Amino acid sequence: MADLTRRAVLGAAGLGTLGLVAGGWSSSPAFARADKWAQLQRQLTGRLVWSDDPRYVRLAQPRNLRYAALMPKAVALCKSVEDVAAAVRWARDTDTPFAIRGGGHNYAAGSSTTGLIISTRGMARGRLDGATLYAQAGARNRDLAAILPEGDDLYLLPGGNCPNVGVTGLTLGGGIGPNATWAGLTADHLREVTMVTATGSVVTASASVNPDLFWSLRGGAGGNFGVVTDLTYELVEVPVRRATTFIFDFTGVDAVSRAGRAWQEARRNGGRLISGSWFAGRATGGVWCRVRGQVLMGGQAASDVLAPLIAAEPDASEVKTRSWWDAYLWYRTPVSPNNTFWDRSLYAEQDLPGRAFDEITRHLDAFPQPGRAFGGFQLLGWLGGKVNDVPATQTAYVHRSARWILEIMSGWANPTDPSVWPTRVPADIREWVEQFWDLLLPYSNRHSYQNFPDPALKDFARAYYGRNLPRLSQVKRAWDPDDVFTYPQAIPLPSR
């Protein structure tokens, strides 16, 4: 794809961001203009957005509408690190609950509050200097992709495949993505951060400056140590100029199970040069699945890698060799509109045995509300390879022996009356998810991905951080001893 076309596509995808930060501060309700809030506005170069502002819902609503009642008094649209520092100091001094929001896609409303949302949405610039990429905290995947270097030499910051997801939250939780098997995690390419601390001071962290903090910010998840405002990355050179994308669709319990086994075989064939997922669900007509991904090769070599999927007799398929940038854009999947859902994840270190696919497809077939709700599963093959070349304790991201993410997905319709938003999962769907979890546990290492936060985890800190938890707790005590940055699944302070 020509560069102009690539930039046009990415630019069009980013138009919505401009609308969110443009315009002035509308007059707020009288109750919201209390003295303390007026004091905050005077300290900001950005604006406070109140509930009567047309931007409010888009800026304040949680990604997961299970938590739609959790709306803030106001959103601070910060324009600079000084704005962020002022907002943190103000929230602490006034004892106002607050949450940090970049992209706003936290599954469990970790970036939501009834008090003040400190938003970095208005800080979304990126800058390139050779193979070094500088980004503000509000930048999204699409913003950074649009400034990647031009010409014959292709460079990449490996990240997620959702263009509208914030890069800061992605990075702080590790940052898996479709290029991770050959390029590593987003966090593995982080070289320096600027952060506002619990006292409102501004610090930097890198391998040589505040190294314990820097270690923690590469996998310790967002909202635990401070507010990251700026990030510096080192790009990786793309090793190929062409890639082959693929889609294979299957329907029926037997065919879907067969496709899952074929997907594992294809991954073994492709090694770190293949990535993708086996995504299966239950519709009114029965169980279906789609295997979708890319291979960093073309021609007969790609066909050989994909041979197990071709031999599995899909209902429909598309295999196409493209320029690398075309393949990169093809793989990107915008996040769906805000909806009501509950997702759970487990890491697996080995391929699943054949019987597991029979068990999974039968359980999908038993989903209690086909047509009225959604029940699904994803065998996500974005791990192994370069990710696992890094020792588990070298960064806070501990899951360096995993090969797969096993992701349970469920979603249900939103009620028409916003006063009764369903914070609870429907009983039959909850039972189905819990049974699914029990089915998958024996195939997992019992760890979960911290960027897919799950309120149902009984020991979330161990599941997210494993052997790195004690060190993370010590760093938490060093940088936030009063637990100013907290939420239901925040890293705990060490026991006294």
Language-model segments: residues:
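Soluble FAD-dependent oxygen oxidases
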Residues: 2-496
